[in-house]
Amino acid sequence: MLTGEEAAREARIERVVHDYVLNHPEIIPQAMQKLQDQQSGQAVAANRRDIETPFGSAWAGNPKGDVTLVEYFDYNCGYCRASLPMIADLIKRDPKLRVVYRDLPILSDESRVAARASLLAAQQGKFQAFHDALYAGGPVSDASIQAAATKAGVSLSGLQSPVITAEIAKNMQTAVKLCMNGTPSWVVGDRILSGALPIEEIEKAIAAARAR
């Protein structure tokens, strides 16, 4: 129990803090953002293996890169499609970067079929070829998925494989744990980023992760 003097001192401190916050309301969103960043970092650290370990060949760049950039994407997401050349530029500009792709099919039934096909491609060592071919083929449909698979030399036998079902479920669960609210979502270091971002912002996050 606090003595009378200690209680009075605590009350004075609380009043100073209260008055400061009232006079500087801009610190509230800053404090909330800092708390959110801390919580995000803890969530990433707790799930890093599931986040950064690629499924088959669903990765690009330097396999021994010192920083891993992870993209959670949906094949029916226009912003994900628009990010494709940016990722290629990042890899060209940063020889120490590894990129891991994680299917997060949340937008449509076609998204889910496309995700299964891309994971089959990853199992067969042909992820990037399928990934590029499907994005180049216009809106996602059964026909465009088949065309991309044919172009990449991917067999679509095994779309309902339990291993692929488990991989998609794991990605969904991880996205919930990380409070992701859409695609594309990015993880680099301990940071979670959302949306179609300029390459400079991604590079800034990569540099921060590298400096840790």
Task: Give short role names for the model-derived ranges.
Residues M1-L107, V163-G182, K204, A211-R212:
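Extracytoplasmic thiol/disulfide redox context detector
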Residues P105-R212:
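Cysteine-centric redox/oxidoreductase cores and disulfide-bonded domains
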